[in-house]
Swiss-Prot record:
Keywords: Host cytoplasm, Host-virus interaction, Inhibition of host innate immune response by virus, RNA-binding, Suppressor of RNA silencing, Transport, Viral immunoevasion, Viral movement protein. TGBp1, TGBp2 and TGBp3 seem to act together for cell-to-cell propagation. TGBp1 is the main movement protein that physically cross the plasmodesma with the viral genome. TGBp2 and TGBp3 would facilitate TGBp1 function. This is Movement and silencing protein TGBp1. Pfam families: Viral_helicase1. It comes from Lolium latent virus (isolate Lolium/USA/US1/-). The keyword Zinc does not apply. The lineage of its organism: Viruses, Riboviria, Orthornavirae, Kitrinoviricota, Alsuviricetes. Residues 139-268 form the (+)RNA virus helicase C-terminal domain. The gene is ORF2.
């Protein structure tokens, strides 16, 4: 257990004043997107045969020997081994989970449940650039810091969704998802993007977001924004008076709303 704690400290995680459990079970670790939490868990599981690591997302991570992080689907855990569950925040009630030794998550991605009290935390992201971190806090009220002395500034833009949508596009499940799908515009649901990252992310919402917004909405915005390692584009969708239609002056084959692969700017 102390070895794991040392690994956390080496990655910038700080011990809180929450008392550790006496039975070494349900140690809670919270890290913001890009804090290195999942990479640390993966490396620790690979390096130690007595450790088993799981995730509640579909993003399994293995080395060539097959060790790493596997998806947890409710199967029994071996309590003789040291077990870690990543992304516990994706369950409806973490209190009902088996007695894992470690429960880890990004607390601001936990839109389904109230996060547990943490024993180790990190607010420093090695992925999210400085300006995007500032934008996330401005929109959500969630604290997140860009890590490192050589700060990568990054950039973010704000505008209507009639501005060109650059990949990767992330949206809620609903009207925006429907409209992009009928125009065959490549995009992902925000809930399917947990664990992913891209240089450029465009997030489209149909309402304004602020620290006063409902927590689930702020969590979804946070998930989308922390997927970006360079550029974040925030777009607002305004529906027309006619349900199911989008006001567009250009024909569908050249519609600026549709970022077909042939229209995408080069990443080079």
């Amino acid at each position: 257990m102390e070895d794991f704690f040392n690994c956390l400290r080496s990655r910038g995680f700080e011990r809180t004043d929450e008392p550790l459990p006496s039975d070494s079970r349900r140690i809670v670790v919270h890290g913001v997107g890009g804090s290195g939490k999942t990479s640390l868990i993966e490396a620790f599981a690979i390096a130690n045969e007595w450790v088993r690591a799981y995730t509640l997302t579909s993003h399994e991570r293995f080395d060539i020997s097959g060790r790493g992080i596997s998806q947890y689907k409710g199967q029994p855990i071996d309590e003789k081994l040291w077990t870690i569950l990543d992304e516990y925040g994706q369950t409806d009630n973490p209190e009902t989970l088996p007695p894992f030794n470690v429960l880890a998550t990004d607390p601001y991605q936990a839109f389904r449940c109230q996060p547990l009290r943490a024993h180790f935390v990190s607010l420093r992201s090695y992925r999210v650039p400085h300006h995007i971190a500032q934008a996330i806090t401005q929109y959500t009220g969630f604290p997140i810091e860009a890590a490192g002395t050589d700060l990568h500034e990054g950039k973010y833009t704000v505008g209507p969704w009639t501005d060109k949508l650059r990949q990767q596009i992330l949206v809620e499940d609903g009207e925006i998802h429907y409209q992009l799908s009928r125009r065959q515009c490549p995009h992902k649901l925000i809930t399917d993007a947990i664990g992913e990252q891209w240089p450029t992310v465009t997030v489209v919402f149909d309402r304004s977001i602020s620290p006063e917004s409902a927590r689930p909405l702020r969590c979804l915005f946070y998930i989308a924004a922390t997927r970006s390692s360079n550029e974040l584009n925030i777009r607002t969708y305004v529906p027309t008076r006619t349900p199911g239609l989008i006001k567009a002056s250009l024909p569908h084959t050249s519609c600026r709303l549709c970022c077909r692969p042939r229209d995408l700017p080069s990443e080079n």
